[in-house]
Amino acid sequence: MYGESFEVVDFQNSWMMVRTVFDDYEGWISTGQLHEVLDISQEKLPSEKRILCSSLTNISNILNHSLWVSFGSEIQESDKISASNLVKIVPSFKFSSNQLSAKQLVDNAQLLLGTPYLWGGRSVFGMDCSGFVQLLFKAAGIALPRDAYKQAEKGVTIDFIEEAQAGDLAFFDNDEGKINHVALVIDSKNVIHASGYVRKDAIDHHGIFNQATGKYTHKLRIIKRI
């Protein structure tokens, strides 16, 4: 994601294995997609003020160069940069619900409806189910792990789907019992999730029901309130 910092774990030809500061997640990126930071220490990075983009945003700098960046991208606070659709300044992210707004989560989820599915993606150019959820909570000031099964370890368990509220997370498992999908609850009967694309579907105690096909697509395992 644009503006996120990381450390290099491995290097092979024109590819780097990196570990992100935000969630300690590892993956490969092309060396053409990074810029080395020389004027800030690693210890200072987490406390640096960031402006978070609330939609697909065009940023421009003092040299009149512009760049489109995704919802959830981080821009270092600077009087040399201007942009529209900025949500707020976030000095750090913690596992805390103090800044959490259910309406904010649902509103942002609806903005992303129709975004194509991309395994490993977490931007408006393509995202998977856990990347979608992580991005929503990041914009609300909440740090969640990258993978669905780790996200399911956070929060408080809600016993019944009828008790679910907007902003809760519904998790689903496969035939082996492993959690492999997550969706944002928008009310006790509907969720928004990334499956083929970011979409709205019905949910009940069995799982996600696709009204177009008349079939259940994901089996409900647990509901959590972060």
Where are these regions (language model features)?
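Catalytic cysteine-centered active-site loop
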Residues: 117-166
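Boundary regions of SH3-family modules and the immediately adjacent low-complexity/disordered segments
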Residues: 2-5, 12-14, 20-115
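Short beta-strand-centered aromatic/proline hotspots
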Residues: 19, 181-186
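Active-site loop architecture of trypsin-fold serine endopeptidases
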Residues: 122, 173-181, 194-201
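Aromatic- and glycine-rich peptidoglycan recognition patches
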Residues: 36, 158, 186-226
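Hydrophobic/aromatic-rich core segments of domains that either
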Residues: 163-175
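Short, basic/aromatic beta-hairpin or loop at an interaction surface
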Residues: 42-57, 135-151, 186
